Amino acid sequence: KSHYAPKTKVPLLAADAIEATLRNDEHLAAALMVTKATQKKLADSGLLTSDRPVITAPETEAAYAHELYDNLHRLVAFGADVILIECPPTCPDWAAVNDRLGRAAAEKDKA
């Protein structure tokens, strides 16, 4: 089954790993999809800049699944060097979302 996989690198990271990535490379042009809480923390830390656009991740599994590919296309359109996505919950209800995100993040490495 074919899934959309951006050509841009798409690591799936925990919130603290996203924060560390942005801190370690202040010039990294990254597009992000993170939770509201993580977005606030990054903004309060001064880690969100004009070359780091953010999409707030949907809070429910149904909304996340419904908006996933549109959000990936929007993130790619920003033209960033990397797309950092905060890992969604790993509970069984989110299994399909996690599978689709994993495919989107990994497929480009098979080329």
Where are these regions (language model features)?
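A C-terminal functional module that forms or caps the active site or interfaces directly
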Residues: 1-106, 110
